Amino acid sequence: MKKNRAFLKWAGGKYPLLDDIKRHLPKGECLVEPFVGAGSVFLNTDFSRYILADINSDLISLYNIVKMRTDEYVQAARELFVPETNCAEVYYQFREEFNKSQDPFRRAVLFLYLNRYGYNGLCRYNLRGEFNVPFGRYKKPYFPEAELYHFAEKAQNAFFYCESYADSMARADDASVVYCDPPYAPLSATANFTAYHTNSFTLEQQAHLAEIAEGLVERHIPVLISNHDTMLTREWYQRAKLHVVKVRRSISSNGGTRKKVDELLALYKPGVVSPAKK
């Protein structure tokens, strides 16, 4: 089956893991994603409805605009994907405009440009909340028109929310399945390149996420979580059924260090969850 690509480039995107995720994702009527990111899982599954959330307000605003004003958005965004805009001077002008703009539609248009023309498809903000990714110097950035239209079509059955993982997981009902793709736990104390946006995800939040998953499965709502395979993640997910997968990093802070690392898919499923350890 042909895989559908997201219209955004995204650090930690789940496109390479789709087959593994779909293999272990339980069936249900509604998919809840508290960390939707670029939406690769949403775009490649067939639930009748979706609840998609992220803490990044720019991302959720963009998705709602693409959903509701598709043609207008595609036309406006296409105008920025021309040879004249592919230079550092224009990029930094657009980046400054994005950071100063209060217009949601214009910000959404600029967000796609910055995503495709910026370095490595990163989405990163400084402590003042300003987008600060440098110019990427790509020969000819791709305008994802087909991907935008496919996203907009699928989005008619989706609701997008800018909120915390706890709030979006609270929306799950007995017809729901939850897939969580949190910012990954660091492989080591010095390897935390996973702070992709201003909100760093703490170890306490990682453990809290697992606690919420345990609570949901007690209500017969299955949860699948992806993360690095470390001693900590195995401790957090000790009540889940663990599946180990290898994935090649698609975005790296050092282009020469893209290698396969072990990742975990932790499945909390009624009847499969281990009893709590005393």
Curated annotation (Swiss-Prot):
Changing residue 181 to G/N/S: Protein stable, no methylase activity, no binding to S-adenosyl-methionine. It is an enzyme of class 2 (transferase). Keywords: DNA replication, DNA-binding, Methyltransferase, S-adenosyl-L-methionine, Transferase. GO terms for biological process: bacterial-type DNA replication initiation; DNA restriction-modification system; DNA-templated DNA replication; methylation; mismatch repair; response to UV. It comes from the Bacteria. S-adenosyl-L-methionine binds at residues 10, 14, 54, 181. Disruption phenotype: Cells are filamented, accumulate DNA double-strand breaks, have viability defects at 15 ng/ml ciprofoxacin. A double deletion with priB is seriously disadvantageous to cells. Gene3D superfamilies: Adenine-specific Methyltransferase, Domain 2, Vaccinia Virus protein VP39. GO terms for molecular function: S-adenosyl-L-methionine binding; sequence-specific DNA binding; site-specific DNA-methyltransferase (adenine-specific) activity. Changing residue 139 to S/T: 75% methylase activity, binds SAM normally. It holds the Pfam family MethyltransfD12. Its EC number is 2.1.1.72. InterPro entries: Ade_MeTrfase_dom_2, DNA_methylase_N6_adenine_CS, M_m6A_EcoRV, MeTrfase_D12, SAM-dependent_MTases_sf. It catalyses: a 2'-deoxyadenosine in DNA + S-adenosyl-L-methionine = an N(6)-methyl-2'-deoxyadenosine in DNA + S-adenosyl-L-homocysteine + H(+). Changing residue 136 to A: About 33% methylase activity, binds SAM normally. Although it shares sequence specificity with a number of type II restriction endonucleases and methylases, it is thought to act in methyl-directed mismatch repair, initiation of chromosome replication and gene expression. Genetic interactions among priB, dam, lexA, nagC, polA, rdgB, rdgB, rep and uup link the PriA-PriB replication restart pathway to DNA double-strand break repair. Belongs to the N(4)/N(6)-methyltransferase family. This is DNA adenine methylase. It comes from Escherichia coli (strain K12).
